[in-house]
Amino acid sequence: MYPSNPRTLDSFWPCRGQPSLPYAPYRPPNWVTRWLTPGEQARYEADCAAGKPNRYGPDDIEYRFNSQGFRCVEFDEIPKDSFVVLSLGDSNAEGYGLPVEHTWPHLLCEKLRPLVASEVCNLNLGLSASSNQHIAIRASRAMQSPELHPNVVFIDWSYSHRILYAYEDGEIMDWPFPTDSDMKSKDPKIKLKRLYYEQLQSEKFDLCNLMANIMLVEAVANLHRIRICHSFIHQSTEKQDWLSRRVDGIVGSRTDVRNARDLVHLGLEHNEWISDLMRDWFKTAGISAKGKAS
């Protein structure tokens, strides 16, 4: 059930006996829109006015969210006996500025269809601006949910500097690096975020925090005998090297044109590449048609 106050600490961490299905606190349930934010539309219109080429028009993308705020099917409509592919990440997984057909979770599922005997169900739990803590929480809840029963999990870990924070008033928020407007803001909450990045955040803490989140989801996955494909594509080369010596994951980098509709997010070509890497991992992971490690 989607909580009435989704961004509060009390709702985010339900009491015993309450539903613990993952939900997207930054997306209204059952929302259908052509623009995720006013900023997305304003940027698009400014780019068009400046004559910048764009493969998408204003009506080419529809964001359609389920009752838990995710860009996928309703959880109670997962086809029986289907092969459930759970995908998680930030805006690159959710598909900011992209039609759903161009997101990497959708492309991946299309590439997995010839490799499994049953129908493939795409559960995309990507959420823009997610910290890795938030991704790990969603992944763990999904793997423990009998309603979702994923067969395999693909996690495209987010930028490691992001962190999930709870304010004293109980509001929760994923913090990315401060924007230019954040640096000028006098809002006490924004000033607190700025203070964290100016005085506390460090590369070593980011790496330690990411590794702790990886261990969390691996523990849950091992308990339920589910294989996880970790993608470290968004980490620096140094972090990829450190992580790959400790975790079986996808590494690599390439320069892709940021050609989503906002001309900021990565587009179809990047998602074809990462979904190819994930498909290749799946081929060698020893996963049966029922999703358990063989």
What is the predicted function of each stretch?
Residues 94-97, 131-133, 160-166, 229, ...:
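Short catalytic/ligand-binding loop motif for oxyanion handling, primarily in non-cytosolic enzymes
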Residues 136-149:
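Short, well-structured alpha-helical segments in soluble
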Residues 64-128, 132-133, 140:
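Serine-esterase "nucleophile elbow" of acetyl-processing enzymes
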Residues 92-96, 125-128, 193-211, 260-263:
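Surface-exposed cleft-lining segments at the edges of enzyme active sites
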Residues 127-135, 202-216, 266-274:
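Soluble or luminal CAZymes and related metallo-dependent hydrolases
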Residues 155-156, 208-254:
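Conserved, well-ordered alpha-helix/loop/beta-strand core segments that scaffold catalytic motifs
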Residues 1-86, 148-151, 156-204, 218, ...:
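N-terminal secretory targeting modules
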Residues 256-294:
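Histidine-centered active-site loop/cap adjacent to the catalytic His
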